[in-house]
């Protein structure tokens, strides 16, 4: 997988968690079965944290967050073969993501998934981190396992100290 790094679209992902230690997930318009955490591409010249905050505002409609940390490494995933020609005109075989852990500092009313007028998600909820993988589409499950493994102890420590 990593031997073709130029075939992976640079992207950021955001694990946004609330005071109870639950993560934000949204149900995409193109699926009735799968939920995902916010993510999106990095624009040319854009810093990774700046991209993560922009994507969060675009997809979740809030900036009431505290950036806690980011993943130590890029996390790669491949798209299914049948999806590659559809996504980004076949330019990429998958995505390489840097994940950011952010604590939500607002109230649920501060979340507006319709913020941009062209939402990514049709609904959203807070979900326990232990069940995030089960809600994800198959080709993102390993990514979610890696992100949870890296961030779960930080989330637990943060919710205890809140």
UniProtKB/Swiss-Prot annotation:
<dbReference type="Pfam" id="PF00293">
    <property type="entry name" value="NUDIX"/>
</dbReference>
<keyword id="KW-0378">Hydrolase</keyword>
<dbReference type="GO" id="GO:0008893">
    <property type="term" value="F:guanosine-3',5'-bis(diphosphate) 3'-diphosphatase activity"/>
</dbReference>
<dbReference type="InterPro" id="IPR015797">
    <property type="entry name" value="NUDIX_hydrolase-like_dom_sf"/>
</dbReference>
<dbReference type="InterPro" id="IPR020476">
    <property type="entry name" value="Nudix_hydrolase"/>
</dbReference>
<dbReference type="GO" id="GO:0034432">
    <property type="term" value="F:bis(5'-adenosyl)-pentaphosphatase activity"/>
</dbReference>
<comment type="function">
    <text>Accelerates the degradation of transcripts by removing pyrophosphate from the 5'-end of triphosphorylated RNA, leading to a more labile monophosphorylated state that can stimulate subsequent ribonuclease cleavage.</text>
</comment>
<dbReference type="GO" id="GO:0019693">
    <property type="term" value="P:ribose phosphate metabolic process"/>
</dbReference>
<dbReference type="InterPro" id="IPR022927">
    <property type="entry name" value="RppH"/>
</dbReference>
<comment type="similarity">
    <text>Belongs to the Nudix hydrolase family. RppH subfamily.</text>
</comment>
<protein>
    <recommendedName>
        <fullName>RNA pyrophosphohydrolase</fullName>
        <ecNumber>3.6.1.-</ecNumber>
    </recommendedName>
</protein>
<feature type="short sequence motif" description="Nudix box">
    <location>
        <begin position="40"/>
        <end position="61"/>
    </location>
</feature>
<dbReference type="GO" id="GO:0006753">
    <property type="term" value="P:nucleoside phosphate metabolic process"/>
</dbReference>
<dbReference type="InterPro" id="IPR000086">
    <property type="entry name" value="NUDIX_hydrolase_dom"/>
</dbReference>
<feature type="domain" description="Nudix hydrolase">
    <location>
        <begin position="7"/>
        <end position="149"/>
    </location>
</feature>
<dbReference type="InterPro" id="IPR020084">
    <property type="entry name" value="NUDIX_hydrolase_CS"/>
</dbReference>
